[in-house]
Amino acid sequence: MTGAGTPSQGKKNKTTHVKCRRCGEKSYHKQKKVCASCGFGKSAKRRDYAWQSKQGE
């Protein structure tokens, strides 16, 4: 059985996220084709949640 310890971390060398062409962040998932930051590829609207800012601001 393989663990998730220190020796396994050395195998993590593949690029998962690349630069998003809508927001410019390095959050666009190559396989899923969705941006984790702005929601590009999933929604025409920008990804935005109320918990991202203080209430009333």
From Swiss-Prot:
ZnF (C4-type) ranges: 20-38
Entry's cofactor comment: Binds 1 zinc ion per subunit.
Gene3D superfamilies, sorted: 2.20.25.30
GO biological process: translation
Coiled-coil blocks: none
Keyword presence, Ligase: no
GO molecular function: rRNA binding; structural constituent of ribosome; zinc ion binding
Cofactor requirement: Zn(2+)
Cellular component terms per the entry's GO annotation: cytosolic large ribosomal subunit
One Pfam family matching this protein: Ribosomal_L37e
Ligand binding (Zn(2+)): C20, C23, C35, C38
Keyword list, A-Z: Metal-binding, Ribonucleoprotein, Ribosomal protein, RNA-binding, rRNA-binding, Zinc, Zinc-finger
InterPro entries hit by this protein: Ribosomal_eL37, Ribosomal_eL37/eL43, Ribosomal_eL37_CS, Ribosomal_zn-bd
Family: Belongs to the eukaryotic ribosomal protein eL37 family.
Physiological role: Binds to the 23S rRNA.
UniProt name for this protein: Large ribosomal subunit protein eL37
Organism: Natronomonas pharaonis (strain ATCC 35678 / DSM 2160 / CIP 103997 / JCM 8858 / NBRC 14720 / NCIMB 2260 / Gabara)
